[in-house]
Amino acid sequence: MVSKVALLLAVLVCSQYMAQGVYVVSKAEWGGRGAKWTVGLGNYLSYAIIHHTAGSYCETRAQCNAVLQSVQNYHMDSLGWPDIGYNFLIGGDGNVYEGRGWNNMGAHAAEWNPYSIGISFLGNYNWDTLEPNMISAAQQLLNDAVNRGQLSSGYILYGHRQVSATECPGTHIWNEIRGWSHWSG
């Protein structure tokens, strides 16, 4: 009986973090800290903003967990933010990782935060290689965001450099996203 209950709970927890087509590794699964506080984020948002963390790249789940914890510690302890800044992050392993998630406003693009979700790739894409599994994960996540009503069907995709004075999301990501259907120059 206990094993059936444990299995049921595991299925429920996993389904909570399953987007329409892409599995999202929960903050608890990657060892993230709880937010100090949150601010709600609406539905049918107009923008998705793509970033890179400009730090360490990761290729395995264990490496990505460590990098995520480091990014979160920097955001919370050094910058004084209540949580990691992005809604979702994508590792070199092709996994999508929960940051602030679907319903909490991020801290990734100043005045754009209330109107957007922030998706960041772990690494520095001025020199790190953007792999096909990472591109696929990001595109699936964006499609899921539309299907679940988080992004409007006519959302606009920006690279961080379009809304702030920065090199983010790095040259390799920048060159990639300019070919995506929702990107706007």
Curated annotation (Swiss-Prot):
Keywords: Disulfide bond, Hydrolase, Immunity, Innate immunity, Metal-binding, Secreted, Signal, Zinc. SMART domains: Ami_2, PGRP. Pfam families: Amidase_2. InterPro entries: Amidase/PGRP_sf, Amidase_domain, Peptidoglycan_recognition, PGRP, PGRP_domain_met/bac. It is an enzyme of class 3 (hydrolase). One of its GO terms (biological process) is Toll receptor ligand protein activation cascade. N-acetylmuramyl-L-alanine amidase involved in innate immunity by degrading bacterial peptidoglycans (PGN). Plays a scavenger role by digesting biologically active PGN into biologically inactive fragments. Has no direct bacteriolytic activity. This is Peptidoglycan-recognition protein SC1b. GO terms for cellular component: extracellular region. Constitutively expressed at high level in gut, in addition to the induced expression in fat body. Its main location: secreted. The gene is PGRP-SC1b. It is found in: Secreted. The keyword Acetylation does not apply. The record marks 86 as: Essential for zinc hydrate coordination. GO terms for molecular function: N-acetylmuramoyl-L-alanine amidase activity; peptidoglycan binding; zinc ion binding. Belongs to the N-acetylmuramoyl-L-alanine amidase 2 family. Its EC number is 3.5.1.28.
